[in-house]
Amino acid sequence: SGGLDTSYTVMYLAKEKGYEVYAACANTGGFSAEQLKQNEENAYKLGAKEYVTLDVTREYYDKSIRYMVYGNVLRNNCYPISVSSERIFQAMAIARYANEIGASAIAHGSTGAGNDQIRFDMTFLVMAPGVEIITLTRDGNLTRQEEVDYLNKNGYFADFTKLKYSYNVGLWGTSICGGEILDSTQGLPECAYLKHATKEGPELLKLGFEKGELKSVNGKKYEDPIEAIQVVEEIGAAYGIGRDCHVGDTIIGIKGRVGFEAAAPMLIIGAHRFLEKYTL
């Protein structure tokens, strides 16, 4: 993703282990063209031999998001499973790429705290059997500060102003981990969110659906529902819509708490649910 954990992983494997590192970013709709370009530049600075963007946004929408809209899916009536729904598509894309280049190992930046590590590991075991799985952050129980110190020591400096938070950004929302999220009595401050609430006052938003898929926003038709989702996200995020914290169970037997901002999913699912009341 180009975040702290994966940046550390690229540099450490290239510099300390002498690996030939192929950096791959599986984009599920959360990166702009500028961000992807920056990811590429950073990957080479960190020591990667090659960098590639694997765009799985279309596959993610076609095989997951549209079905979550059909089903008005909210985990515990709260969380639109923004991250967990996209991980399998990221993992499959990485596994396919690893097989394509004949990689002997696949590294990912998951910690030992939640379900993501299981999603990645199991997918790689199934789709790339025999390939070694490397998880430096998890296996070394590394702190974020330790990773920053290592990168700085080796001449790599980046904007880690939100050091205590870990983000995952996709078409169906952004997750925020760390900081206040680790304390069940606290919520996230405004500065923790990537998209800031800047608008006040009412605004009328009209969403149009065809066979369960979002096809128009405020009267403007979109052939591609992905584009329509992005428009709704921009409108809703400016009001701070879709912010919350979710507490769920993990397969490793502990509770997990995650903050999120998901304006588009909350608005789209809410509108679709009420539309069904009138039409079904």
Where are the model-predicted features located?
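Beta1/beta-strand and adjacent pyrophosphate-binding region of the FAD-binding site
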Residues: 1
